[in-house]
Amino acid sequence: MMKRDQNTLGRLMLDLEGAILSETERELLQKSSVGGVILFSRNYISPSQLKDLIAAIRESNPDILIAVDQEGGRVQRFRKGFLALPALNSIGKLYIRDAYKGRIMAEQSGWAMAAELMHYGVDLSFAPVLDLYNRKSRVIGDRAFSGSVEGTVDLARSYINGMNKAGMVATGKHYPGHGSVEADSHEELPQDERSLDAIISGDYQVFAKCVSHLAAIMSAHVVYPAVDTEIAGFSRAWIKDRLRSDLAFEGVVFSDDLSMGGVSAMGSAEQRAERALEAG
């Protein structure tokens, strides 16, 4: 489970340059403003190297949160020496054929992913994806369980249950829904042109029905013109009003990567971080 008190953690989550912690990075991780570090494929060579890297991180800051995107399918940062996890949509396809077997597979996948990461000292995988499947989405696509609210909620709860049994809390993403835009927010800023009713009755419903099972939520780098002109992670309407107030979510809200192409033009790194904090 989440071992750290979110109120005492620093607000920044940093990434690392390579597979070995540099002296500069060691010093950065000791700053009180830093509460977490996210690992990518460039930080991973082998299980033994990962153990050494995590030991070095913990030596610099024993209380820091260590996270990774280990969803399965095409988004799995640690591969060699780790289980090959299924894409969530393959679980969704099984669910269509046999709902019971789909739920079992979801729970087993969540447990296996979490148990393996925690064995190496990783606290969080940013999972599961709660976006609805839409074939036009390049960036989400088969990362999503299903195109239906009911199927996504059912499988997500089973997956989260598996994570929890292994001792890891869940982070739902990408609030309030990234699956209905074609553009990839790693490269450009997507706009979701759906009406507010369509958003609320779609992806948002998944978050609403799963919120009590989540310790954290990651926001989307997507603009929803039906609500405002801000990306969701900078939007008080989406974070403070709907997530914090309407859904009564008291957990951690992670912004998606603030160095991504979709937000890189929105001021300096410091300004982008401030805007995310101000949103709630």
Predicted regions and their residues:
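Alpha-helical scaffold segments that flank or form the walls of functional sites
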Residues: 97-122, 203, 272-278
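A charged helix-plus-loop insertion that forms the helical arch/lid used to bind
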Residues: 82-100, 146
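Second-shell residues forming the walls of enzyme active-site clefts
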Residues: 14-15, 21, 42-62, 66, ...
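Catalytic domains of carbohydrate-active enzymes, especially glycoside hydrolases
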Residues: 27-40, 112, 119-124
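Short, conserved phosphate-binding/catalytic loop or strand-edge motifs used
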Residues: 130-138
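N-terminal basic, low-complexity leaders that serve as flexible interaction/assembly modules and, when applicable
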Residues: 2-34
